[in-house]
Amino acid sequence: RTDETGYTTRVGLEGAYANYLLGTKGRRLEQKIAKGQWKLASGFDIIEPKDGYDVVSTININIQDIAHHALLTQLKKYKAQHGCVIVMEVSTGEIKAISNLELNKKTDTYTERYNFAIGEAHEPGSVFKLMTVVAAMETRNIDTTYVVDIKDGKQQYYDKTFQDSQHHFTGRISLNKAFSVSSNVGMTELVHSLFAKNPSDFTTQLLSMNLNQQLGLPILGEGEPFIPTPRDKLWSGVTLESMSIGYAVKITPLQSLAFYNAIANGGVMVKPRMIKEVKEWNKTIEKFNVEIINGKVCSKQTADKAKGMLADVVRRSYGSGHRLYSPDFSMAGKTGTARKNYANADASKLSYISSFAGFFPVDNPKYSCIVVIHEPDRSVGIYGADVSGPVFKSIAHKIYTNSLLMDTVEDVENVSEKTTKNYEDYYAKAAKYKTVMPDLTGMNVMDA
């Protein structure tokens, strides 16, 4: 990246770890002699150049390839403006894949030009509902059976009307169902009933979960998250309700994923990491270990309840992510569909952000993943489950099918004596007779 003064800063890992990669320049004094030749002028003032170290990244090239092409497929299908995907290992925070693609309108192709996953803070929409229910459970001692009234799918606070995009239920339903169907009215009713008199209780809990803080990545350009508080000048009578469904707040995809990963990790938030170690040939110079950002974004009990709610989004027939369900492997996550320019009075010019965040498998999660796609063509589709969800499912499915599965075979008590003797005879012969491979050096394939 070149600034206005002409100074060039490398982006990505090269820029973040330049102090390891660059090495040091050498120096020696030489004298020009006849015929344009040079000779060493002095043997005392010599500084030998030193190669830079090798940086070992956490990226898994197989998962990276899967994630990149899954994202590219959906971007093309929905004619989207740009998108990103991140896959992270739950227990360690190691980034296994990260892809950022943007449409080049001149060539009508998708290329990597900007790191949206790390740098783009935006209103996340419904994926933020996880943060809302976790904050509610932590501060008001409620659980998934707490009842909210979603009425007929519409609710007005002051001059703003909140409504559900899809109507599965009406009236009083459990918080778990409201979350599963991604009810906007259910979430606004939840925070209004619990926090309307003391909204600072809600925002304070969000702040305690590190949602207003950058992750402190070594890579330049991390986006700045924003969580409003009642003390802010722009706080209004509907800010609390707007926050509950992922508006009036800003957060980057990686910051969102760090929170989802914390829920999968029992409430422990680990720092996303892209480097394993620094090496010089086979010698380890520095090793990067797991770093805990927040040892308790919520209690393990709350995390377990939240995991169950995220699982129901996919496995329940009425869940907003049920179309992603597979009987072959388990997934948990949350759909998101956010309006980008909702202040525009012309509804025909609205654009959307489609997202899906979650983890897999449900029991003992191994990987967390987030997919965010901006401005899909409205005529093709806009909903998170349709646009971004298939990227998540494709990644989870291919990782699952490519994983080495080892089955434990129990010892058999009644073993045939004849079979046992046959095996003993075979191993005895194998140990006695040695096979010699002929020397085929220098021979072509046909002769060999």
Language model segments and positions:
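Small/polar-residue-rich segments within soluble enzyme cores
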Residues: R1-K50, V371, P390
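Serine endopeptidase catalytic core focused on the charge-relay Asp
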Residues: V11, G15, I61-Q74, V185, ...
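N-terminal leader/targeting segments and the immediately adjacent pre-domain N-terminus
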Residues: D45-K76, N414
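C-terminal, active-site-flanking charged/polar segments
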Residues: D363, H374-D377, A385-N402, M406-V409
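Conserved catalytic/cofactor-binding microenvironments
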Residues: L404-N422
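Glycine-rich loop/hinge motif
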Residues: S416, K421-A448
